[in-house]
UniProtKB/Swiss-Prot annotation:
The keyword NAD applies. The record marks H181 as: Activates thiol group during catalysis. Algae contain three forms of GAPDH: two cytosolic forms which participate in glycolysis and one chloroplastic form which participates in photosynthesis. These three forms are encoded by distinct genes. Keywords: Cytoplasm, Glycolysis, NAD, Oxidoreductase. It comes from Chlamydomonas reinhardtii. InterPro entries: GlycerAld/Erythrose_P_DH, GlycerAld_3-P_DH_AS, GlycerAld_3-P_DH_cat, GlycerAld_3-P_DH_NAD(P)-bd, Glyceraldehyde-3-P_DH_1, NAD(P)-bd_dom_sf. Pathway: Carbohydrate degradation; glycolysis; pyruvate from D-glyceraldehyde 3-phosphate: step 1/5. The active site is at C154. One of its GO terms (biological process) is glucose metabolic process. This is Glyceraldehyde-3-phosphate dehydrogenase, cytosolic. It comes from the Eukaryota. It catalyses: D-glyceraldehyde 3-phosphate + phosphate + NAD(+) = (2R)-3-phospho-glyceroyl phosphate + NADH + H(+).
Length: 341
């Protein structure tokens, strides 16, 4: 036994592939199986190796009809549409990363347990699964009852650490969030049908598209003290990766912008190091491609109108930062549950 935590990935899309890349950079976790009904092993290898945003994987990757090999290690591959038919147990996967965007509630995600998985982490918000954000409420994870959990969204992972620090130090009376969000796979390259979201059906290139997001309200689930105090919306913009949160809040306690930045900087160097980061340089979005932090506070971009009314700005690589938190959460779950350590 290698001593590494063994995980499986269901859905080899943007997050699935980047979660795998993130595990390759860690000594204590490895992917042993991948399921995707739309991709064979040869195509998996190609999609893993070449990435338009995060560049070519520098190591050895090979895919054939016989399997998918990374750095000489064979990855079990499945092409099942029904998650209950995936033999995770035979592949040795104890924790499954559910990254299809389809099986996002407890009833659907529980199907992975039938195949031998012990725990499931959903890489999307869930209506009923407990939601955990690293650096915010992950210590509340209960291995005895939490078999299916959610890692929330990339935007919630950026917003929640920021809101936690500000609320704990100065108190948030109420606030509005806007995320200027990079393109995602659900958007269209040319105008097309989108019955539930007409504006979302417009071409991604050449448009700034207003959109809804539950990210701000979801903060109330991981930080109950902020329930009902935050809401927000999104603008989808034609960039490949990296998004930015604008959090505008009314504070309970009068303060200065400098003191807020001091509190955030201290948190980034202390209890939230690795999750929350801080910069006072003249940065732009591309500077954060493949940045592993959930949230990087931009000290120069924020503004304050009065001692209790402030706009805070924070960057996040909505793909790579989030994928690293998925891996962190899997390691935390394994540690708490003592899964094959």
């Amino acid at each position: 036994m290698s001593g590494k935590i063994k995980i499986g990935i269901n859905g080899f899309g943007r997050i699935g592939r980047l979660v795998m890349r993130a595990t390759m950079l860690r000594p204590d976790i490895e992917v042993v199986a991948i399921n995707d009904p739309f991709i064979d092993a040869e195509y998996m290898a190609y999609m893993f190796k070449y990435d338009s945003v995060h560049k070519t994987w520098p190591g050895h990757v090979n895919g054939s009809k016989d399997g998918f090999l990374v750095e000489g290690r064979k990855i079990h591959t499945f092409t099942e549409s029904d998650p209950s038919k995936i033999n995770w147990g035979a592949a040795g996967a104890d924790i499954v990363i559910e990254s299809t965007g389809v099986f996002t509630d407890i009833a659907k995600a529980t199907a992975h347990l039938t195949g031998g998985a012990k725990k499931v982490i959903i890489t999307a918000p869930s209506n009923d699964a407990p939601m955990y954000v690293m650096g915010v409420n992950h210590e509340k994870y209960n291995p005895a009852t939490d078999h299916i959990i959610s890692n929330a969204s990339c935007t919630t992972n950026c917003l929640a650490p920021l809101a936690k620090v500000v609320n704990s130090k100065f108190g948030i009376k109420e606030g509005l969030m806007t995320t200027v969000h990079a393109t995602t796979a659900t958007q269209k390259t040319v105008d097309g049908p989108s019955k539930k979201d007409w504006r979302g059906g417009r071409a991604v290139n050449g448009n700034i598209i207003p959109s809804s997001t539950g990210a701000a309200k979801a903060v109330g689930k991981v930080l109950p003290e902020l329930k009902g105090k935050l809401t927000g919306m999104a603008f989808r913009v034609p960039t490949n990766d990296v998004s930015v949160v604008d959090l505008t809040v009314t504070l309970e306690k009068a303060t200065t912008y400098e003191d807020i930045m001091k509190a955030l900087k201290e948190a980034s160097e202390g209890e939230m190091k690795g999750v929350l980061a801080y910069t006072d340089e003249d940065v732009v979005s591309s500077d954060f491609v493949t940045d592993p932090a959930s949230c990087t506070v931009d000290a120069k971009a924020g503004i304050m109108l009065s001692p209790t009314f402030v706009k805070l700005v924070a960057w996040y690589d909505n793909e790579w930062g989030y994928s690293n938190r998925v891996v962190d959460l899997a390691l935390h779950v394994a540690k708490k549950a003592a899964v094959k350590v």
